[in-house]
């Protein structure tokens, strides 16, 4: 049975592309001003001054974020709570789901009807579509947003609200920052030099480095580089698809290709899995990686691995930390897909939703308005305490004092990214890593790919919820071992995965996805 959905009629593509996303703030898609943030009403400290909202009764709110609580987190949020108490007569308690546990525990918050109000979410990788299909998030009407978060409504681009819609309803407040979806690597520069490598700019280069590490008795990474691989093939995850979008891909580098690709029937996936088996057999990473509770950065920071794959900003953050603690490692950054044009993430790649069971939805939205548009709250959440963690340089820059207790943008503040008030870092003593980061970022900005209509598509699984749940329940028995090369026989394992997916209903999911995609493309064509 063919798992790749049939190609949609190419005529639907004409005029169907969404407006191009620029790599800077204020690309002309918003309703309000995206100019000088310090002159906006939100930036002037008037956010939250909503005369229509009743704040006479004190409420205690709870928000869930992703990651780990940093040492100074509670101290920082105590400062934020002082502002919230004064302006909104409420307090905010924050709980965390770690990187290692959010895949399993996120949905349990809703199935157990845990009492909380706000939660970080994101398309595909952080459970947005799946939670909406289960009824976990409160729908946010235009009137509700305008009433309780008027400043957010003025700032967030119209395109972002459109991307957040599922079946015509908005269920998250999307972030406003243009981010790149391509993964890069933070890599031990001393080892690259040892192996005679000046840079890693292609998949072949990356495999050469991994093999050199294995031959040298050093783990190259904490697992198989699946994202860099499918990105090297020009593919991207599909919003709302099973396994965080990774089970069904689309050819984002080719706007005329409207065929979804189920990985079990993709020859390149089979070849990748065999290559990963060869690598793990050679010792490129631990054979016990599936049982590890380590965070993604743990291997690099402890010296157990030679690299870490993540986004630009995160690789810079942990690369700097590694270099501060081990200067001789000379951690640098590389783009293993240097010659490919770059995809800009949709705005719903980060966001915040309100729990459908929240007893204080209005106050929760008002709190989010503060996080998103009040510069005092925004700076605290992103940078920490001024004078302890950072200091201001002019009106729109900051200089790091100490990141050990509260790292810059390392505390899941990404859900309310707002580039109209976000400070840029002033780097007094630039390092080679800073320069490499800027070089790669500039290269990304100068090589943005053409839009693909599916870049903004998000699959709604509610019509195939039984099949979707069955696929999600069965896939981990095969998927994680395969992408990390931890199987005895690749072909037999993929065949077994396909049989399990057949039984679970993967074809029903693909058929429904194909139907929705056809409607989505037709709707874009009309617009």
Where are these regions (language model features)?
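N-terminal secretory signal peptides that target proteins for export/translocation
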Residues: 1-4
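Extracytoplasmic/secretory soluble proteins
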Residues: 8, 12-13, 20-527
